[in-house]
Amino acid sequence: MPILIHLSDLHFGPAYLSHLGETILKEIDAVNPDAVVVSGDFTMRARHNEYRAARDFLEKITRPTLAIPGNHDQPLFAPIERLVNPFGRYREYINRATDSTLSIGGLFIVGLNDNRRILPGGFWSGAQREWLAAQFASAPSGAVKVVATHHQLMWEGKARPAGFWFPSRALAFLARRGVELVLNGHTHVPSAIQSPEGIVVARSGTATSSRTRHGCGNAYNLITIDEKQISVFVRRFDEQSDGFIAAQADAFPRRLNIG
C-alpha cells in the first residue's frame, strides 16, 4: 500500500516555525512513507538565506522527495531577475528542474511548475502539457499516477476558473492520462475532494508557517492508497500535545472502481 506525505507552503523566512519543521522531520522518519511531495512556496520572498534554510530542510528528509516551486519562490524584490530568470534561485538551491518526476513504491508522480511571472492562479503551457502526456505514457504499468502543482485545480467542489488554461480542462486532460490523485497547496487551507472525473484533489495546509488562514492551523497530509480507495488524512499541529494529530480523514473510491 503506497504511503505519501504531502507538505506545502513551508515559507522559510520570518514566519517559519522551526519547531514544527523539526517535528515534521521526526514524523517522516516514524511513518517511513514511500515518498514525500512538497508542493511549492519553500520561501517567503525567495531570498538566498531562505533558500539555504529550505535546502537544509530537504537534505534532512530521509525518504525520496519530489519538489516543485510556488509563486513565493520567485524573487519579489529583484524585478529584473524575476522577469528574466524567475526560478534561477530555485534551481540553484532546490532542483535544477522545475518540472520533474518520481517513480517509486507503486507511485508515478509528476511535479509541474504552474507559476508564471505575472499570471495569477496557475497556468500550464502547451509544451508542459505535451511533456506531461509523454511522462504518463511511459509510466510503469500498474503505478498510481499522481500530479503535484502549487495552485489548486478545484475550489468548493468545482473546477476553479483561473489562468488562461482552465482547470476544468486540466482535470479532463489528466483523467485521459489515467491520473488518480492531484496534490497542491497555495491557500494554506487543507481539503480533499473528488472531481467529476474521479480524480482525488488534495490540498495541504501550510506545514510550518505562522501565516495560517481561517483558523485551520498548521497541517500537512498523510495519504494512503490501496486497491479500493485513496485516503487523505489531515494532520494538524496541536499545541497541547506538542505534535501533529489526526484532524480529518476522507476516503474516496479509486477511479478504476467508479461506475
Per-region residue spans from a language model:
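Beta-strand-turn-beta hairpins that frame and shape the catalytic cleft
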Residues: 1-5, 101-111, 137-144, 195-201
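N-terminal active-site segment of His-dependent metallophosphoesterases
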Residues: 1-60, 76-77, 97, 134
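Active-site neighborhood of phospho(di)ester-bond hydrolases with catalytic His/Asp-centered motifs
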Residues: 7-8, 36-41, 65-71, 113, ...
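Active-site environment of divalent metal-dependent phosphoester hydrolases
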Residues: 13-16, 44-49, 71-79, 117-120, ...
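Extended active-site neighborhood of metal-dependent phosphoesterases/phosphodiesterases
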Residues: 52-131, 139, 173-175, 222
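Short acidic, glycine-rich surface-loop motifs adjacent to enzyme active sites
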Residues: 141-156
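Conserved beta-sheet core of the metallophosphoesterase superfamily
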Residues: 159-231
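A short C-terminal boundary segment appended to hydrolase-like catalytic domains
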Residues: 225-259
